[in-house]
Amino acid sequence: MKPTRLSYALRWLVFITVWSWVIAQPGAPVVTLGSPQVVQTRNPKAGVHTRLTDEAAPWKVQRTLQLVREMGAPWIVEFFPWAYIQYNPQTFDWSHADEVIDHARAQGLTVIARLGLVPWWARPDERVQPTTFNYLDRDHYADFGDFVHAFVEHYKGRVQHIIIWNEPNLSFEWGLRRVDAAAYVDLLKVAYQRAKEANPNIVVLAGALAPTLEPIDSERGLDDLIYLQQMYAAGAQDYFDALAAHAYGLTRPMADPPDPARVNFRRVELLRQIMIDHGDAAKQVYITEAGWNDSPRWNQAVKPAQRIEYTLAAFDWAQQHDWVTMLAMWAFRYPRAARNYQDGWTWVTEDFQPRPIYLEIQQQLRMTNDK
């Protein structure tokens, strides 16, 4: 049966109706950097570890960083994966990294860039050798060095601090291999030299060691105190400007004294002593991950009120120690809720609702009530 004029009219009416509905929907917000902002704070060492790596929407990137500024924290640590930026060997995609860094700077924030995560072309064939995205063999150290050089050169004048790798004293972060401090130092040397070629004034942070008590024969990792000693023994001293450290309190209060036999926030003081013992007292420590979890679903968490108390004390502690440049708490916000105990680390929900810890820390950090 041939279409009638009525059927044509109905089809046209449906098309117009649907199209009108589509164009009436609100589009993505137009995001501009806006006028430069200044962080108002009582504590110039306060920071947070943001997780914008997988945040696709520009307005969400901007809003996250606005909330950091409004809280009164002038520092952020952010991950810039090699695997994302140099997905193919010959090309670099700076678009998302530019977005994060430019918005952070517009909010008056100082960015510490954590570099790592190996692209597919620099990892073993997973069909032959199953591993993680953190596996990098010596044959590709130069490739990582080239990436570090490109990153530092691209962000000269915008990023002044980089962290080389993350928690290399854990097997998972070393590609499911037995950890190797000497191999990490070799990687650090390559990265340091290439970074300084691009910008002699860049601050290269080493370590970012996970606080752990794993013994020397463990397949899971190695005690961070032992690992740092091994780094010095392997000649690391000449290839980093400052130490990145992780300071998690678990169930212990901030004031719990440092002890080599347990993990607590002040364990970082033991790392500092190792630096002093090796003649590195002049170097600073940047605490790039830290904090307490307040999830009721995890046996290593604390109550929300305890988390607030310990965090307030930790920021005060940082101000009292001149060898600490900054203290970044994990983790400000996840792009998507984890729906498990990991959400107990966050300060702001995925839909930008401040949690109680945000509001309490904001009250401590802000110099005025103006936003």
What are these regions (language model features)?
Residues 7, 11-41, 46, 95, ...:
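Aromatic-rich peripheral "rim/lid" segments of glycoside hydrolase catalytic domains that contact
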Residues 44-50, 76-78, 111-115, 162-164, ...:
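Hydrophobic faces of well-ordered beta-strands that scaffold small-molecule active sites
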Residues 141, 145, 179-308, 338-341, ...:
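Noncatalytic carbohydrate-binding groove/subsite architecture in carbohydrate-active enzymes
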Residues 72, 149, 155-160, 227-242, ...:
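Structural recognition of alpha->loop->beta junctions
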Residues 21-74, 79:
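Boundary/entry segment of secreted carbohydrate-active catalytic domains
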Residues 46-60, 129, 133-138, 219-221:
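Acidic/histidine-rich helix-loop elements
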Residues 55-70, 143-151, 221-233, 308-316:
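Short, acidic/polar
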Residues 71-216, 250, 281, 334-338:
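Substrate-binding cleft and catalytic face of glycoside hydrolase catalytic domains
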